[in-house]
Every structure is written in structure tokens, then in C-alpha cells.
Amino acid sequence: MSGHPAKDPFRIRDHVVEFDDIVAEIVRRSEETRANVPMVADVAYGADATETMDLFFPEGKRDRLPVHMFIHGGYWRMFSKRDYSYVAETVTNAGAIAVIVDYALMPTVRMARIVDQVRRAKRWVFDNVAHHGGNPGLLTVSGHSAGAHLATMLFDGDERPFGIKAALLLGGLYDLKPLQMSFLAAEIAITDEEARRFSPIDHSFDPSVGVDISVGADETPPFHSQAALFTDHLDTQGLTVSRTTLGGANHMSSVRDLGLAGTEAASLLARVVAA
């Protein structure tokens, strides 16, 4: 019997050797995207300094274009919209406006605040994106990890009108209770109330939304089990839901690939954008 403690399956750094290299790559690629893709930076959707979004545009005329929101992950406590600008490459190449959303981070704020922020970001898009050449009637969403969790909050039972046509949920967290026993207990201390209120596995959802639940083949077991449970949960509610296992991908390489043309993840994203 080994004397070494088991690795926490939620602590991604312990399971992805190239974690730091991938983070450095996506940050570098994001700066390239910001330099090369037409954009409007730091558009405010609220009064707080954290309540901003970046809009990226395809080349050419902007007239009632599809719109896609992306919500970044980081266990609600790290990263920013700037780190994920590269996702806009796939979205704009598919002919849509990319909206990369920022939000406040735990533990400085609690989860209720973050959920409220992303919902208000969606409402800003509904009310204002037409002024930027977008069609709010063609709105889709994606998110990775904690961002996938937050993306579900844009079409759950509390968020009416829904207005989301399709969603891509990548490496998502849909039952928050296991996280209370993970390394995150010392970092963000998810409360019993937060786990109860904000676990998507306990929510109802808009049955008109098409959802792809994706997970990397090399992710740790909880991400696979949560994907399976949430797929079944949505299916029982009548949503059109598919589940994709990304071959050879881990929690970090899968999100990196969202902005790399020709990868399975980027193809899934482009398909959702075109829904």
C-alpha cells in the first residue's frame, strides 16, 4: 500500500503535466488575437470594474450577425476574459460576434454575485448587441469548467426569458457538493447553501436549447461522471442533448483547442455557433 496520499481529482495541475505550458500558450495566443481580430474592449455590462466584456468581430459588414458568449473557467477564482481572447478566433471565423465575459472572483465575492453577473451580461447582449451589428435572436453560449457551470445559469428555470439557442459545455461542473471536499475547500469554501442553490444537476432548464456536453478523454473520473449525470438530467427534461468525449484531450488541452482550427473542440464550437 502506498504511503502517498491520493491526488485530488479536482486539482487539475496534479493531473496535467503541461498545465503551465498550456496556460502560457493560451495567454500568448490571446494577445495575438487581440492584436489581429477587430474588437471593442472592456464594454461595461454593470457598474463594477469586473463587469466588462470584450467583443470580437468577423471581417466585413456587421449586420445582424450571430452572437456567441464564452465564459471562462478557473474554479470561479482565477483567470480573466483577457486570457481567453483566443476563443474568438473560432467564433469569428464562423461568422459570429464573440463576447468574452469577465466576472468577479471568489473568495472576494460569493457565487451568487458571479451568477448574477453572467446573467446581467446576457441581458446586456440582448439589449445592446444590435448596436454592434449582432442579432440577439441568434445567441449561443459556451463555457469551460466553472465557465460551463455558469453557462448553464443562462438557460435555467430562473433565467427568463431564456433566449439561448444552443450551448457547448466543456469539462463542466454540475454538482458542486463534491467540490466541498476537494482542495477548493481551503480556497473558496463553497457553502452548503451555494452547493444547494447553484448545482445545475438540481435545476430545470429551457427545453428548446440544444446542448453539447463535452469532456476530454483524459480528464479525471469526476468530470466524466458529472458529464454523464448532467446529460441524463437534461435528457429527462426534454432538451436535445449530446455527449462528446474528446479523444486524447485533458482538462487543459481541450479548452486550448477551442481556438485551434481543425481540432475536435473547435469544430464543436463552430457547430454550436451555427445552430
Stretch-by-stretch model annotation:
Residues 1-275:
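Alpha/beta-hydrolase superfamily serine-hydrolase fold, recognizing
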